[in-house]
Amino acid sequence: MSSTLLIVVIVVVTALAFDFTNGFHDSANAMATSVATGALKPKVAVIIAAVLNVIGACLSTEVAKTISGGIVNDHLVTAPMVFAGLIGAIIWNLATWLFGLPSSSSHALFGGLIGAVLVEAGMSGIDAGKIMSKIILPALVAPFVAGIASLLATWLAY
């Protein structure tokens, strides 16, 4: 087996490990309320979460589009950088899960990849404007938009 093929296999296995941590990390966040209130039994919640994660992975490509949409310079990204980014995201997912902290696996993946590219290629490896417009600004604006939407929905309902 050539060294390039070995690196690709290692990156793919690491991506599957990230996907596993993404599943148990984010699924727990999504299903906790249903299980805690008794609306769903834990086994049913796990089955629903698994099925919906598979469907979501098949139907949604927005995270992949964002990553490939120019936030990092594609020509500078190498398999070891992707591996380092995945390892960083896995460690972050496990740490936040261990301490019971809410976090986004997608943002962990963005952070891991951006960090790996910064270390290897420096500022020339990233597009700060796209990072601001595609990741940071939406993360800052979304809570306010959700708050206003919920306020309006509450006013309309009562």
Question: What is each stretch, according to the model?
Answer:
Residues 1-158:
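Alpha-helical transmembrane segments and immediately membrane-proximal extracytoplasmic
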